[in-house]
Amino acid sequence: QRQMCIRDRDASLHAVGLFDVQGKNVLYADQIFEPLYPASTTKIMTAYVALKYGNLDDIVTVSERATDFAEDEQVCGLQAGDQLSLRDLLNGLLLYSGNDCAVAIAEHVSGSVEAFVDKMNEEARNLGATGTHFVNPHGLQNEDHYTTAYDLYLMFNACLQNSQFVEMISQTSYTANLTSASGVPYTMTWEPTNYYASGDAAAPEGVKAVSYTHLRAHET
């Protein structure tokens, strides 16, 4: 495995890329091959793998591990023993950036988080994202967890070819149907954490925002 040197993160560390997808041209680039911590943009590849290998109608039982997050870490509020569909989990992942959803998805699709992460790395390489290495499906910081702006473009563009992904990230809210460990049905509603998707902010003039909740630079 390659060893990557990642500079200490600060406010000035950034990367910017502007891509012409149809013409397959890079219109603007600033440090697009610089290794950076991806934070919740990790969930782009989590969704890609889940959509490729999972069945959206499968019913998933949430494990204890999937609920084991600190109070200040973003979760959808799942409880151990909850049952909900893979479709519900993906919506919680993409709309509300649920780290609990990421782990539940990984365990269901591949049997374990570790096996799922192996698949994430394999699929990233298949897309040409050779400057990327994942160690978890949610993006919580780890020194060996990194990507580049160019690789993010490759992965996000691949996801945009999937109509189900586009539909999920375009919603203004989603209501999931769950059954608790004790067998009681209940619902949870999630709204986007992205200001553009929620309507709390407008895109610059002449720019159309294709919303992705977690396309940002700060730590999850």
Where are the language model's segments positioned?
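Active-site-adjacent loops and short helices of periplasmic peptidoglycan-processing enzymes
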Residues: Q3, R7-Y150, C159-S163
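Penicillin-recognizing serine hydrolase domain
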Residues: R9-A11, S112-E219
